[in-house]
Amino acid sequence: SADWENEDPTCAAKYTIAVPSEVDVETAKFAASYAYTANIIFMASGNKLYRINLDRGQVTELYAYEVDSSAQIASLKFKDPESVREENDGEAEGEYKEKLGMCLGLGINTGEKGVVVEIQLTMAGDISREERSICVYEDPNQPIGKIVDITYNYE
């Protein structure tokens, strides 16, 4: 058997963070990516996305789905949270891998339909200022039903 199978789980650190009053900690969703090694995680609650800097104890609102303030973010996932630049990667491949780990998808339920929003983040965890850094996927002719979870397919 592998060594890791016999190890008890360990906790590397414990943080206490004050979250905004509108955040429901019982239903909040969290995501982390290898691209953010500086103790940054992301949280969604209601229609808002937040960046949490664990080292500084800061919670920053990054995005709100303003079309419907009662919308609920049901899922948030990075395109590839395990994507890491390898030493032998060429420059283009390395940059591509880094961007995958900084692209966050949100599955949002609003009324009777679902909306998928994809956000390109920077190395600091801010929303990129590049054109099309926030893409909203919805088609009134082919509405998405209620979203439970989202995933990425690379085929």
Report the location of each language-model feature.
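Beta-propeller fold detector
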Residues: 7-17, 60-66, 128-138
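Short, intrinsically disordered, charge-balanced linker/junction segments flanking boundaries
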Residues: 138, 147-155
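Structural motif
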Residues: 1, 47-53, 111-120
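Conserved beta-strand element within WD40/beta-propeller blades
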Residues: 41-44, 102-109
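Repeated scaffold domains used in trafficking and secretory/extracellular systems
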Residues: 23-33, 68-91, 144-150
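Short loop/turn segments immediately following beta-strands, especially the blade-tip
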Residues: 2-5, 54-58, 119-127
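Intrinsically disordered, low-complexity acidic/Ser/Thr/Pro-rich linker and tail segments
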Residues: 1-23, 30
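Short coil/turn segments that connect the beta-strands within blades of beta-propeller domains
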Residues: 38-39, 98-102, 155
